[in-house]
Amino acid sequence: PRSTPLYSSAASDVYKRQFPPLACDTHAHVCGPAARFPYWSERIYTPPDALLGDFRAMLDTIGCARAVLVQPSVYDTDNRAMLAALAQDPGRLRGVAVVPFDVDAAEIERLHAAGVRGVRCNIVDLKTGKGQLPLDALRSLAAKVKPCGWHVEFLMHVNEFPDLDRQLAHFPVPVVFGHLGYAPTSAGTSDAGFKALIRLMKDGAAWAKMTGPYRLTASSMPYPDTDAFASALVEAAPQQLIWGSDWPHVIVKTGMPNDGDLADLLIHWVPDAAVRNRILVDNPARLYGF
């Protein structure tokens, strides 16, 4: 596994004035300490330690009162590092776990009590099974987590799934897509999979995270080629959008972003303060149960 650069943090407190009270960063990962929480042997990268104290300092700097920790692929189904972080700040944090498909109700209830509000399916950062959506198993898992009011979060490239809305029709729980749908900007906003995502969002069945523009771009900060994707989502379904920093920016190839600049980018994408308030406060409160 290859290592990654150290994470960034926001450079100054100039960003604080732009985010409303109770703003939520809905996408970040804690990694390590590796000696206490060893990484999965089948991981495709090895992150530097990215610890809760540093993450909370970043949140304070950009003005986020709440946050959601998402289980990274380097831990597979071992959620201990994420759960340890949730236990340190249960009022501020929620979690999205990775669980085996045969997870039982008792484990789901244990995770719910710890602050978990969803499960993640990552079909990108894999050695095997990459790009394959195990729909039958996912429907079964979704039925198991539905009593807790959870959702299923996907890390996938929507441009690879032109029939996405039909494949996920009548899915038992809401679905959430990371990184604006994770279509490369070269696919364009007329891409069939991206349009299918928008249809799901308009129906209230799906959410999208305004995260990781550096994972889609063919450019560099401020990633101007991602603007059209963000605008299309904001115009179509602002009630189904949430924002996240994607801290600590693992396996980023375009240069380590500054988290304050990413906060500024949301202001650029969503200049209307009322809409921004929905994306930062109301929508995540509804999805994660703050």
Residues of each region from the PLM?
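Hydrophobic faces of well-ordered beta-strands that scaffold small-molecule active sites
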Residues: 24-28, 67-70, 94-97, 119-121, ...
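Active-site gating/metal-coordination segments in enzymes
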Residues: 76-159, 166-168, 207-216, 220
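Mid-to-C-terminal alpha-helical segments outside catalytic/metal-binding sites
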Residues: 12-22, 48-66, 232, 238-240, ...
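Conserved, mostly hydrophobic/aromatic
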Residues: 27, 59, 82, 119, ...
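Single conserved hydrophobic/aromatic residue that forms the stacking wall/gate
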Residues: 1-11, 15
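Alpha-helical scaffold segments that flank or form the walls of functional sites
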Residues: 41-89, 109
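Glycine-rich phosphate-binding "P-loop"
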Residues: 38-49, 67-70, 117-133
